[in-house]
Amino acid sequence: MPNGSRCPDCGSSELVEDSHYSQSQLVCSDCGCVVTEGVLTTTFSDEGNFREVTYSRSTGENEQVSRCQQRDLRRVRDLCRILKLPLTFEDTAISYYQKAYQLSGIRAARLQKKEVLVGCCVLITCRQHNWPLTMGTICTLLYADLDLFSGTYMQMVKLLGLDVPSLCLADLVKSYCSSFKLFQASPSVPAKYVEDKDKMLSRTLLLVELADETWLVTGRHPLPIITAATFLAWQSLRPSDRLTCSLAQFCKLANVDLPYPAASRLQELLAVLLQMAGQLAWLQVLKLNKRSVVKHIGDLLQHRHMLVRTAFRDGTAEVETQQQQQQQQGQGQGQQDEVGDGPFDLPKRKRRASPTPLLPPCMLKPPKRTHTLPPESAVTGDEDISDSEIEQYLRTPQEVRDFERAQAASQAAMRVPNPP
């Protein structure tokens, strides 16, 4: 019992010291009454012996989120809710933003890049969960520049070391075609333009697969080719009523934006269909063009695997085929059937046109290269040649003697006076 104290409640002298965490207490062992307790906080005199902890060594619990980061986090949540993404997507996008914001290359960036970072986090989350969403859609919602967005997106993926799978084209076709306002009759859409969603979607998928097989999709933005394929699928289902409708009118009816390269992708896809139509026997008698071939898209898609093999040849095997033909011509095979009697006669039997090589459009129609002309030389050939330079052209002793003899004769002729 310290100092002969007693419990004020029961009067017991059995008092023990009990340390409660960092606060010492004097407790009665009989009734449990706390008789005295120490001071939990320190006094000013005690704090004089303590050492202050710097911010760099602290736990960072008192650190506050900046206003810019708070605003961007709210924008991440708002963007996920506008796109109607699941809550798990929202949490993942927020975590990606917080990780990216700690990087020095992004934290010290300008304000426009931080605003674009919001869309990059949402796009990465959607790509990882195989959610069909394009970069252009987010740029439209954020009013962001596409070049700045793509650069920030690649930088973020590289710095964070993320594994982002490529976008599935079939899922993108389904989500993009679902936004078309052509599946229900309305005052802005006449009844002849309304189409069944499943039929239009299935035919659009087949056209996009055909474009992929013929190198029209590789290295290009997907939305223009999907827009062109959707337009052709919509026209081919009821060609009598829809052939007069242009691509711009179709996009206006569907309430979607017309991508700039969609018209070029449409012409390329029509050229492929026209090439395939020349391989079908019942279509060879018809003089088809890019307008009338739309009526037969159903037949072309039904036999597209066979038609692609017959209408196009593999570009990689083209060189081997040419070498084989050269060897056969060198051996003299088939020369009597195709060449006339005279040396300048035309072939008697006309050869069949070879199929178009199956190559990307950039290789079939390469851009013209600018040829730089060589600089014009100032040497005309009439300049005087010095004696030291002439010695460079003399190679044999006989040439040296001849030159000396000719030079002496020239000097002697100059010394002879002219006759009066």
UniProtKB/Swiss-Prot annotation:
Keyword terms, alphabetized:
Activator, Metal-binding, Nucleus, Oxidation, Phosphoprotein, Repeat, Transcription, Transcription regulation, Zinc, Zinc-finger
Q: Where is this region: Disordered?
A: 316-387
Q: Give an example GO biological process.
A: cellular response to oxidative stress
Q: Which Pfam families match?
A: BRF2-like_C_cyclin_rpt, Zn_Ribbon_TF
Region described as Required for interaction with TBP and formation of a ternary complex with DNA and TBP:
366-420
Primary location group: nucleus
Annotated zinc fingers (TFIIB-type), start-end: 3-36
Residues with the Cysteine sulfenic acid (-SOH) modification: 362
**Region listing for Required for the formation of a ternary complex with DNA and TBP, in residue ranges:** 358-364
Q: Which InterPro entries match?
A: BRF2-like_C, Cyclin-like_sf, TFIIB, Znf_TFIIB
Task: Offer a single GO CC term for the protein.
Answer: nucleus
Cite the record's Low complexity compositional bias ranges: 322-336
| sequence repeats by residue range | 72-157, 173-249
CDD domains (UniProt xref) = CYCLIN_BRF2
Positions of the region Interaction with target DNA? Answer: 108-114
Task: Give the molecular function GO annotations.
Answer: RNA polymerase III type 3 promoter sequence-specific DNA binding; zinc ion binding
- Could you confirm whether the keyword Protease appears in this record? no
Residue positions, PTM Phosphoserine = 354
* Residues at which Zn(2+) binds: 7, 10, 28, 31
Query: Posttranslational modification, per the record?
Result: In response to oxidative stress, Cys-362 is reversibly oxidized to cysteine sulfenic acid. Oxidation of Cys-362 impairs formation of a ternary complex with TBP and DNA and down-regulates expression of target genes in response to oxidative stress.
Cellular localisation: Nucleus
- UniProt-listed PROSITE patterns: ZF_TFIIB
| UniProt record similarity statement | Belongs to the TFIIB family.
So what does this one do? General activator of RNA polymerase III transcription. Factor exclusively required for RNA polymerase III transcription of genes with promoter elements upstream of the initiation sites. Contributes to the regulation of gene expression; functions as activator in the absence of oxidative stress. Down-regulates expression of target genes in response to oxidative stress. Overexpression protects cells against apoptosis in response to oxidative stress.
- Subunit structure, as described in the record: Component of TFIIIB complexes. The TFIIIB complex has two activities, alpha and beta. The TFIIIB-alpha activity complex is composed of TBP, BDP1, and a complex containing both BRF2 and at least four stably associated proteins; this complex inhibits the transcription by pol III via its phosphorylation by CK2; YY1 facilitates the TFIIIB-alpha complex formation. Interacts with TBP; this interaction promotes recruitment of BRF2 to TATA box-containing promoters.
Q: What is this protein called?
A: Transcription factor IIIB 50 kDa subunit
Please give the organism.
Answer: Mus musculus (Mouse)
Q: Taxonomic classification, please?
A: Eukaryota, Metazoa, Chordata, Craniata, Vertebrata
Q: Which gene encodes it?
A: Brf2
